[in-house]
Amino acid sequence: MAKRIFDTSYLIGHWRIFPKATKRTTDNMRAWSEKLIDQYGTRQIVTPVYIEMVAGVTSSDELKLTRAYLDPFEIIDEGKIPKRDWDEAKVMSQRVAPKGGKRQLGDCLVRAIAKRFNCEVLTSDKGFPAR
């Protein structure tokens, strides 16, 4: 079985279903992400996923919660994205799906990095580029 990494769409979807009756604290958000990790048996993400999550916050409080949520994850590329990943993302960006639709820079780069690490990408994004 291939290793698996989470895409931003999976993390955002999980973030949004945090129980409404529970207060969002750094400890609770960290524990919440650990539940996702336990459920899927992986804690791996890539740098673009981390950046997309952090870039989506709208306040300093939300930033603290997001960082706590992301703490348990392992960034497998360690922030090192070589030229070959960019080249692969470029190739993916030029693939037009039969039904059309736009490709996103982040999605293409996530897929390229995942390919380098021989990982399956867990995503809920229907337009995510195929291998």
Model-identified regions with their sequence ranges:
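A generic structural signal for short hydrophobic patches within well-formed alpha-helices
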Residues: 11, 50-53, 128-129
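Short, well-structured N-terminal submotif of metal-dependent ribonuclease cores
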Residues: 1-45, 55-68
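Conserved glycosyltransferase catalytic-site signature
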Residues: 8, 47, 104-108
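A general structural signal for well-ordered alpha-helical segments in protein cores
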Residues: 30, 50, 63, 86-89
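Short secondary-structure capping/turn micro-motifs that flank functional sites
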Residues: 105, 129-131
